[in-house]
Swiss-Prot record:
One of its GO terms (cellular component) is ribonucleoprotein complex. InterPro entries: Ribosomal_uS8, Ribosomal_uS8_CS, Ribosomal_uS8_sf. Part of the 30S ribosomal subunit. Contacts proteins S5 and S12. One of the primary rRNA binding proteins, it binds directly to 16S rRNA central domain where it helps coordinate assembly of the platform of the 30S subunit. It comes from Alkalilimnicola ehrlichii (strain ATCC BAA-1101 / DSM 17681 / MLHE-1). This is Small ribosomal subunit protein uS8.
Length: 131
């Protein structure tokens, strides 16, 4: 059975694992999921991630981060969906919680945060919001 929205599935798995206070979460891997995990790691929302398993069915394992027993990620919300894509140009990229959170954007130069996209002068598809 194929998944309709693999990015939403990834975000839901991370959100549920953090609520259950799990140390890590695993899911089927893809290039876009690895790029999102890389942005989350660079921004300090997760400890690390690794891709394992065999070549036909790679698996993405994400080590979650907690601070004083509380999850670092407070909110993890999907912005764009397969049925309703959300594209923004560089001037209208959203600021999440007045800059305290990040929006993860897929641009022509790769997946990056809203701040990095603004600095590079790129717009793109807003994938999700993290706070």
């Amino acid at each position: 059975m194929s998944m309709t929205d693999p990015i939403a599935d990834m975000l839901t798995r991370v959100r549920n694992a953090q609520r259950a206070e799990k140390a890590e979460v695993s899911m089927p891997s893809s290039k876009i999921k690895q790029a999102i995990a890389n942005v989350l790691k660079e921004e300090g929302y997760i400890e690390s991630f690794e891709v394992g398993g065999d070549e036909k069915k790679p698996e993405l394992k994400i080590s979650l981060r907690y601070y004083q027993g509380e999850p670092v990620i407070r909110e993890l919300e999907r912005a764009s969906s397969p049925g309703l894509r959300l594209f923004k140009d560089k001037g209208s990229l959203p600021r999440v919680r007045n800059g305290l959170g990040v929006a993860i954007v897929s641009t022509s130069k790769g997946v990056m945060t809203d701040r990095a996209a603004r600095e590079a002068g790129h717009g793109g598809e807003v994938l999700c919001y993290v706070f």
